[in-house]
Amino acid sequence: MTSHDPKAVTRRTKVAPTKRMSRFLKHFTVVGDDYHTWNVNYKKWENEEEEEEPAPTSAEGEGNAEGPDAEAGSASTPRQSLDFRSRLRKLFSSHRFQVIIICLVVLDALLVLAELLLDLKIIEPDEQDYAVTAFHYMSFAILVFFMLEIFFKIFVFRLEFFHHKFEILDAFVVVVSFVLDLVLLFKSHHFEALGLLILLRLWRVARIINGIIISVKTRSERQILRLKQINIQLATKIQHLEFSCSEKEQEIERLNKLLKQNGLLGDVN
């Protein structure tokens, strides 16, 4: 009869949901993510659960030591002065920018809902329709900001922008919504595309989900980087302690030999 390792079974139960999550998150990559690395190495989510193995051998330790040194070397390269594209790239990858985008998307969704309630007469509008006009122009201003965001993202990331499906879909929704909203500005009557416009604008709530995922992923990457740095420091400290212990052991052996040679070891014991 074959014996089942309970630890292996537990590991498989942990890996299964992690594997599903990794396959789901790889479709939510955005500009700034390493597209090829994410698609090739997305199994790192499940591999993290399988890293509970014995300590590496000396050869592996040397290999691992080369890795941090290489990373430290690459990180210690002098920073060049940031040009306009580099500053924009840093801005688009920042956590604060994602929070601003989420807030604007929420505000845009609320404005569209308010317009919808006024159009359906659920909320009685004023006689001059000032509220509808104000909501519409505010929503259009937010769309202009999103259009500028897409333009500068394409300017900064170029072909990398088109490697991310979610960015393409989000850009499509923004552009179509912008065109329809622009037509509505010059049309006094409501036309048949108004329902499509509302549907597209409300669909952008998915951007909120994407922003939350990016924020969580960014914080996780920062935490992983911090833990790696702590791990490197602890590994260096362990090496120093092991070297110090070996020196102490050699010194003890040398002193024991001297005691034996002088016949003092028995008296000491």
UniProtKB/Swiss-Prot annotation:
One of its GO terms (biological process) is regulation of reactive oxygen species biosynthetic process. Residues 1-96, 158-165, 215-269 are cytoplasmic. Residues 221-261 form a coiled coil. The modification Phosphoserine is found at S93. Keywords: Cell membrane, Cell projection, Cilium, Coiled coil, Cytoplasmic vesicle, Flagellum, Hydrogen ion transport, Immunity, Innate immunity, Ion channel, Ion transport, Membrane, Phosphoprotein, Transmembrane, Transmembrane helix, Transport, Voltage-gated channel. Phosphorylated in vitro by PRKCD. Phosphorylation may enhance channel gating. It is found in: Cell membrane; Apical cell membrane; Cytoplasmic vesicle, Phagosome membrane; Cell projection, Cilium, Flagellum membrane. Signal peptide: none annotated. Residues 46-79 are annotated as: Disordered. Enriched in immune tissues, such as bone marrow, macrophages and spleen. One of its GO terms (cellular component) is membrane. Changing R207Q: Same activation kinetics as wild-type. Gene3D superfamilies: 1.20.5.170, Voltage-gated potassium channels. Chain C. Homodimer; each protomer forms its own proton conduction pathway. PANTHER family: F20B24.22, VOLTAGE-GATED HYDROGEN CHANNEL 1. Belongs to the voltage-gated proton channel (VPC) (TC 1.A.51) family. This is Voltage-gated hydrogen channel 1. It comes from Mus musculus.
